[in-house]
Amino acid sequence: MQDFVKQLMEAAKAAGIEECEAYVSSRDSFRAMTTEGEVVEYESNLTRGLGFRGLYRGRMGYASTEAFDEEAVGQLVRGVMESAELCEDEDEAPLYDGGGPVPDMDLRNPALAQVTPQEKIDRVLAMEKLVKESDPRIDKTAHNVINTGSYTVRIVNSHGMDRSYTEDVGALYGQATAKDGDFVSSSGYGVAARSFDGLDVKKVGGEVARRTLDGLNAAPVPSGKYRVVFFSEAMCDLLGVFSSIFSAETAQKGMSLLKGRVGERIAAPCVTLVDDPLMEGGMGSRPFDDEGVPSATHTVVEDGVFRTFLHNLKTARKDGVATTGKARKVGYASAVHVTPTNFYLKPGKRTLDDMLRGIGEGLVITEVSGLHAGANPISGDFSLLAKGYTFREGRREKPVEQITVAGNFYELLSAVRELASDLTFPMGGIGCPSVDVGELSVSGT
């Protein structure tokens, strides 16, 4: 690979490409899914590809390959030149010059990579068995999944930059259905971790069973205004679907109402929103972004005040600011976009139970669905199917389902009254505690 990249760079220079970058990614992944104690899906893949981009006659061109021979060199160079000639975007930023120290981060866990496929299958089967045997009302277990992967990224460019990292990750997820007379309840739970021990059978299986059983005998509440608390994981889903409004790329396309509001108050004083790619154990952690820019922590919203958009080199150049190092490619062949890393709401000091006792009565939303159809990131409006439970004097009362909770995310940020201390990152890079958002409209019976 070293010789191939060197040959590619030399060929690009000889062809008149002014500057260029090779982005190499490799992925060694495993996935197994079980249903009712049987393995129904099994995948083990090793893939490697190279994305190549270069500035030719003032325009950026793109090409990619999964072949690494002499013929591929010529195809990549020609592909970049042809792509650049068709490009109408004149706002491309120059490639990163490679300056600045790269944080020393160890994202490897060789022990995870050495776990055998059978050991992984045994783990997901053990989790499923635990759920099934936890209560006679558990009727079915399905879509129980274990994933593991080892991923390597290497970026080399014509400015002399050559940096790489490798990470090991895994995830364990379970789902179940319970029956009690005419009542049926389904729920799921999962964890992501950088170690095999982090894929805890008792934790995942116990939570799947508890959440599924907690939903039995659920019913809608009467329609009206309710004091609403989003449970941490439901709040993560909500923040995740609206995270793009904090992207400079989105704002520059006129698709974020935060455009032009840096320095203004956009949220309640208790709201602080951070993007931290240096977080130990974070699923979004990385030493540099997908343009090679060293990672750094940024406070996006501080005590309710909007401090910065998230940027890559292109958006930063357009706004006349420094990049925040949040460039991301969804694959080696994709264009560069802006994406948060470990993006989270800073937690408060009180536990969820203490916060609920302080509120008195209301509705806790534990799950939301229909996020893509029911949420509009441009306007901020949302209307989502939800599950949860009512509470009084801080104590859980009745399970709730088949309701719709509606509001506006921009208004919700300003309406936040308190954040609990239970910060969690459910399965990825979005983290939230449980949040008291004041009153929202709920449609039920």
Regions from the PLM with identified roles:
Residues 1-445:
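N-terminal small-residue-enriched
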